[in-house]
Amino acid sequence: MVEIRKGDFSLDEVAAGMKSPEVGAIITYSGTVRQFPGGAGLNFEDRQEAVQSLKQIEKRAVEKFDIAAVAIIHRVGFLGITENILLVAVSASRRKAAFDACNSIINEIKDLHKSWQREVQK
């Protein structure tokens, strides 16, 4: 599941939706806007190609790791300090595969940010 939205997300709701009898681990990551010198927040452009890029990241993770499901939610627009930016959740029968997949997904998304993230000064 890949979603780009303006509104916030619920980590608990996403994780609850990933539970199933064969799943033994659900790993979640929530990225937030951190303070930076003179910063008011970050602006993420709502780009059409972003959805496709995130879907490709999801697809690669499913193919590479022994996982059951992936959820990626990325917010767009202006996000102030401490606001949620990104949710990545991965479910698997074993924790190692879930941790490894989650880390891989986060690293790939971080590379995407270089093209559609802009710092906003106070």
Where are the regions that the model predicts?
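N-terminal, polar/charged subdomain of small-to-medium soluble alpha/beta proteins
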Residues: 1-84, 92-122
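Phosphate/diphosphate ligand-binding glycine-rich loop within oxidoreductases
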Residues: 88
